[in-house]
Amino acid sequence: MVARRTLLAAAGAATATAAIAPFSPLSPLAATARAAGARLPVRLANNSGHDVVHAYISGTDSSGWPVFVSADGVLNRLPNPSTTVTPIADYSIALGASGSAATNVTLTDYVIGGRVWFSVGQKLQFFVNPGPVPGVVQPALVSSDPNWATDWTFCEFTYNSANLYANISYVDMVALPVSMASTGSGGDQSVSPLPTGALAAIASGLRAQHAADGAPWERLVVTDASGAVLRVMSPTHSPVGFGTYWDDYLNRVWSHFASTPLTIDGQGGIGSYTGTVSGDAIVFSGLDTNGVPFTRPSATDIFGCASGPLYNSGADARGAIAARLAAAFNRGSLLVPGGNDQPDGVPPSGYYQDPVTNHYARLVHDHADIGYAFPYDDVGPTGAAPVDGHLQDSAPTSWSITLGADGT
């Protein structure tokens, strides 16, 4: 989604460029509870059916330095270590048993590009690497990660002087359900959790899709020792490549648009551009591609929307066209009725109809009411209601996050 990408990109830029005095454990920077940031009561509830649940709140402070919030609401700036993969101190927040009273934490300062994490049964392991600004090593979706066998999930947020913006996302994975609610100047807002049974249904659907087309969809399903589903990863985190999966679809697209014009509206005042296939690229008249033509993308390019011809490079217009083309590839919406007019020509009912499509995203949308399933899932017909699963308030007075399917 646009807002989610913006907040994460801004947080990343701040981390990369912040110039901060060396950390001293005796410095008041070790833990900050500044009056400059408005206090925000946060309610962490366990409705998961599991009695041992830990929460974590991580992000950066307003200067871009990584922080963890402890149970007392204080922002703890991480020391800059001397060696790589240094374990981070335990900032876990123990929640009560499932169905018990919520645990209350009051944020005492702003947190940028943050996450609220939950883990079931055991604590998560976080690490930090040295640098001009230390880099946090978060739980990763690879089997060598020490948190691989732990059941965990997260939601994303930024809390700054402008607003609280928080969202759930399935861009990386589907796991334990999380719901949210807030109060403030924007009224009462809520975000629904993943419905009961959705995780198992998505896993089953991916296994069935593998049986149907032979692509490695089943490798996206992660189970524990008993065979229970822990999480379903998006194709960007697949342990094996999808190789030539998209080749047939791309061949048909390139053949079709060799003689049929493709018009893409960049929306937001960008304007529309029309192009046809010329050689191995779709060439849009009047569009500056910044030296990166729209050639045939790879499977990695399509699923990740962040490499090759779909990398959001150059001027705003090229980035907007790349985003809408990436969405059309993932949804298989270029060859359906109206597909030559993106994104307005195809309603959501026309998405994922081609046998070659992003079946992870298809199944997420089949079983989840809200939440994005790939990076440009915010692209849609002009005026369409967003389904990103976010809340936003310029003057929040409370924020609740619940682990479990029965939530807000």
Question: Language-model segments: which ranges?
Answer:
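Boundary at the C-terminal end of the N-terminal hydrophobic targeting segment
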Residues: 30-35
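Extracellular low-complexity, O-glycosylation-prone Ser/Thr/Pro/Gly-rich "stalks"
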Residues: 36-408
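Compositionally biased regions
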Residues: 25-28, 71
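N-terminal export signals
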Residues: 6-26
